[in-house]
């Protein structure tokens, strides 16, 4: 990437070391960071989406265990109570649960809990960065193959929500192949779904792509199908918050509709994920993956800057109209062309996933 961007980092400039994170709620209008120094602050940051994106949530959770270890002064039994609070902060992204469980497993036999918690969190974070790079390489090979098949020099990719470096350390998942394509000199244009109601595409993905100098166009969520009908989308790449053993994919609400449109128009639909996003305990994702329901205010209100450049939050609905706000949907495996993972590309079915990830 052009810049040395990070969604989170350890900050030891203060009296006690803390986790510093970009406050993603304020982007793209204001770049600001938050210092997380307590378990409560970590949980709140995850819940209120100061940080978001499956991978980054997992990384914050891992460092949250380190912060909690300092709070309880190395007492493992007390740490288990803090870990549970972090683990339950959001229900859909499996990376969160995986990171907490992995940290607690690694620390169960530790004689130096605080020091080891710091080391293990850094190791998990670094491992995720390497996985992101592998996804970039495998995904870019698909981009190159599609260009070759279509005898084109320019590719149009549609993505939904945000699955770049703000969401997954270090280059993301869905955006990682796009960043790699740019490094290889490929002419890339990205259709960016706005991704209502929180507008992660319009606010975050567009901001990332702007920083990287990648050509992109923000579109209304309902426009993707028309673009596919007109042949203006060569492929779709999205990330995921949880993938079941049979290949069903939970991702930001609206992903399922894009997959249906892609399937109907013969557009390949790819999901980019690290190993930690798989939930092998769930056999049928459509029926079993828990779906987070968030506040209806996210639908009723929208945030932006006015003509004077002032950041405002305004209501766009009748005051007394009810709302429904599920944060995710599940795309059945049959609609997915392939999964782009850190271990290579595989079809979204039980046998291929098991062979690649469980031996």
Swiss-Prot record:
Keywords: Amino-acid biosynthesis, Isomerase, Methionine biosynthesis. The keyword Amino-acid biosynthesis applies. It catalyses: 5-(methylsulfanyl)-alpha-D-ribose 1-phosphate = 5-(methylsulfanyl)-D-ribulose 1-phosphate. Its EC number is 5.3.1.23. The record marks 161 as: Transition state stabilizer. Pathway: Amino-acid biosynthesis; L-methionine biosynthesis via salvage pathway; L-methionine from S-methyl-5-thio-alpha-D-ribose 1-phosphate: step 1/6. SUPFAM superfamilies: NagB/RpiA/CoA transferase-like. The active site is at residue 241. It is an enzyme of class 5 (isomerase). Substrate binds at residues 52-54, 90, 200, 251-252. One of its GO terms (molecular function) is S-methyl-5-thioribose-1-phosphate isomerase activity. HAMAP family: Salvage_MtnA. Belongs to the eIF-2B alpha/beta/delta subunits family. MtnA subfamily. Catalyzes the interconversion of methylthioribose-1-phosphate (MTR-1-P) into methylthioribulose-1-phosphate (MTRu-1-P). This is Methylthioribose-1-phosphate isomerase. The gene is mtnA.
């Amino acid at each position: 990437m052009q810049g040395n961007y990070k969604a989170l980092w350890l900050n030891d400039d203060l009296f006690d070391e803390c986790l510093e994170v970009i406050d993603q709620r304020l982007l793209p209008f204001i770049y600001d960071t938050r210092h997380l120094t307590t378990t409560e602050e970590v949980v709140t940051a995850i819940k209120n989406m100061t940080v978001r994106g499956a991978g980054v949530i997992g990384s914050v959770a891992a460092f949250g265990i380190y912060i909690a270890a300092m709070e309880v002064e190395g007492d493992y039994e007390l740490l288990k109570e803090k870990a549970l609070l972090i683990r339950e902060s959001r229900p859909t992204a499996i990376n969160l649960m995986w990171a907490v469980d992995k940290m607690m497993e690694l620390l169960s036999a530790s004689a130096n809990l605080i020091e080891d918690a710091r080391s293990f969190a850094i190791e998990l974070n670094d491992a995720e960065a390497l996985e992101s790079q592998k996804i970039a390489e495998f995904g870019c090979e698909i981009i190159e193959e599609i260009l070759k098949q279509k005898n084109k020099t320019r590719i149009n990719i549609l993505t939904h929500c945000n699955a770049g470096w703000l969401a997954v350390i270090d280059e993301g998942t869905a955006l990682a192949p796009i960043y790699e394509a740019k490094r290889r000199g490929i002419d890339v244009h990205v259709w960016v779904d706005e991704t209502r109601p929180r507008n992660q595409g319009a606010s975050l993905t567009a901001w990332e792509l702007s920083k990287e100098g990648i050509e992109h166009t923000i579109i209304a969520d309902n426009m993707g199908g028309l673009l596919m009908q007109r042949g203006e989308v060569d492929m779709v790449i999205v990330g995921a918050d949880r993938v079941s053993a049979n290949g069903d994919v939970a991702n930001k609400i609206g992903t399922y509709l894009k997959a249906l449109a892609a399937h109907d128009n013969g557009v390949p639909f790819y999901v980019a994920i690290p190993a930690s996003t798989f939930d092998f305990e769930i056999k049928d994702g459509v029926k079993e993956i828990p779906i987070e329901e968030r506040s209806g205010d996210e639908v009723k209100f929208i945030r932006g800057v006015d003509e004077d450049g002032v950041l405002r939050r305004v209501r766009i609905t009748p005051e007394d109209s009810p709302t429904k706000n599920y944060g995710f949907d599940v795309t059945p495996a049959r609609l997915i062309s392939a999964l782009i993972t850190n271990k290579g590309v595989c079809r979204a079915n039980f046998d291929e996933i098991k062979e690649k990830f469980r031996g």
